[in-house]
Swiss-Prot record:
GO molecular function, one term: rRNA binding
Function recorded in the entry: One of two assembly initiator proteins, it binds directly to the 5'-end of the 23S rRNA, where it nucleates assembly of the 50S subunit.
Origin species: Prochlorococcus marinus (strain MIT 9312)
GO CC annotations on file: ribonucleoprotein complex; ribosome
A GO BP entry: translation
A Pfam family the protein falls into: KOW
Subunit composition and interactions: Part of the 50S ribosomal subunit.
Highest taxon listed in the record's lineage: Bacteria
InterPro entries according to UniProt: KOW, Rib_uL2_dom2, Ribosomal_uL24, Ribosomal_uL24_CS, Ribosomal_uL24_KOW, Translation_prot_SH3-like_sf
Keywords per UniProt: Ribonucleoprotein, Ribosomal protein, RNA-binding, rRNA-binding
Protein family: Belongs to the universal ribosomal protein uL24 family.
Protein name according to UniProt: Large ribosomal subunit protein uL24
SUPFAM superfamilies the record matches: Translation proteins SH3-like domain
Length: 118
């Protein structure tokens, strides 16, 4: 899969600072302003799946006789550049930076406030 992505004309892999379980706010697109938890990250495609955001409807036909068709609603992925980390405590969005603490452990913090995430 990585080889096929590299063959694309504009392939650019960016280090994702957003991780699964983070609370993010959508900053661009039809769901702009909504917040949700990251369910899944797709680093090779620079995309994230956020709970309750970018919902898509899928119509499923019956596969066996006697079974009824159904309509499924599921979250589609968003590009990572369209979401930003959201701090509940301060009620603001911020970029994330990495730093090494006094014990030599690499951690993340908010650039605006300096609040340590993990």
């Amino acid at each position: 899969m990585l080889d096929s992505l590299k063959q694309k004309k504009n392939f650019q892999r960016i280090k994702m600072r957003i991780k699964t379980g983070d609370l993010v706010k959508v900053i661009n697109g039809k769901d702009k302003g909504k917040t949700g938890e990251v369910l899944k990250t797709i680093p090779l495609e620079n995309r994230v799946v956020v709970k309750g955001i970018n919902l898509r409807t899928k119509h499923v036909k019956p596969t066996q006789e006697g079974e009824t068709g159904r309509i499924l609603t599921e979250e589609a992925s968003l590009h990572a550049s369209n979401v930003m980390f959201f701090s509940k405590d301060k009620n603001l969005t911020s970029k994330i930076e990495y730093f090494i603490d006094k014990q030599g452990v690499k951690k993340r913090r908010l650039k605006k406030t300096g609040e340590v995430i993990d």
